[in-house]
Amino acid sequence: MPGRTRRDGGSESGGKDRRDRRDGGRGGAAQEKTPQFERVVTINRVAKVVKGGRRFSFTALVVVGDGDGMVGVGYGKAKEVPAAIAKGVEEAKKNFFRVPRLGGTITHPVQGEDAAGVVLLRPASAGTGVIAGGPVRAVLECAGVHDVLSKSLGSDNPINIVHATVAALKQLQRPEEVAARRGLPLEDVAPAFMLRARAGQGA
């Protein structure tokens, strides 16, 4: 009887401890995670021809961002779609970069190119919204850009468009950086809407 009591007691306490550790682990991970946006741009099925036939796998292009200036793009490949998306998310997190913004728009017009993809981005006034197609919109929304005009001038391949958009965003610079590099006052290089906003705040 004492032996059985020890076994029962041990299993109950051990199971409770294991449940507590699992719950605590999940809770801790949830608290550490920062809010993020994930957009799956495209999923493709890939066939590899081998001696015994064809083997299929899936690729996923994923955009991840915090909606506050940080964004990254990842490409995942696996035998199942969820696994491919998960790999894409992990790679996107490793490729995070910061996008300079003024309010909810970009700092200046810019054009990005990657392979045959060409994307043009222009600042827009507040309330305009994201005027962009699917792949470009996914990147801009995840980056926290709410007002922007865009146009795709090259390939319609979603992968090329996404990478061209990223190339364009990486070219953005803040007016303060441009003024310091050129040795000019901020008023000479800052966009008009930025100066008007500052004047309104000063008044």
Swiss-Prot record:
Q: What is this protein called?
A: Small ribosomal subunit protein uS5
Keywords, sorted A to Z: Ribonucleoprotein, Ribosomal protein, RNA-binding, rRNA-binding
The family database entries (Gene3D superfamilies) matched by this protein are listed as: 3.30.160.20, 3.30.230.10
Q: Which species expresses this protein natively?
A: Saccharopolyspora erythraea (strain ATCC 11635 / DSM 40517 / JCM 4748 / NBRC 13426 / NCIMB 8594 / NRRL 2338)
Record's keyword annotation contains rRNA-binding: yes
What disulfide bonds does the UniProt entry report for this chain?
Answer: none
**Protein role:** With S4 and S12 plays an important role in translational accuracy. Located at the back of the 30S subunit body where it stabilizes the conformation of the head with respect to the body.
A Pfam family cross-referenced in the UniProt record is Ribosomal_S5_C
| One GO CC term, this protein | small ribosomal subunit
Subunit details: Part of the 30S ribosomal subunit. Contacts proteins S4 and S8.
What domain notes does the record hold? The N-terminal domain interacts with the head of the 30S subunit; the C-terminal domain interacts with the body and contacts protein S4. The interaction surface between S4 and S5 is involved in control of translational fidelity.
Q: Where is this region: Disordered?
A: 1-36
What GO molecular functions are on record for this protein? rRNA binding; structural constituent of ribosome
Which family does the similarity line name? Belongs to the universal ribosomal protein uS5 family.
| GO biological process, alphabetically ordered | translation
**S5 DRBM domain segment(s):** 36-99
Give the InterPro entries listed for this entry.
Ribosomal_Su5_D2-typ_SF, Ribosomal_uS5, Ribosomal_uS5_bac-type, Ribosomal_uS5_C, Ribosomal_uS5_N, Ribosomal_uS5_N_CS, Ribsml_uS5_D2-typ_fold_subgr
Q: Which intervals carry biased composition (Basic and acidic residues)? A: 1-25
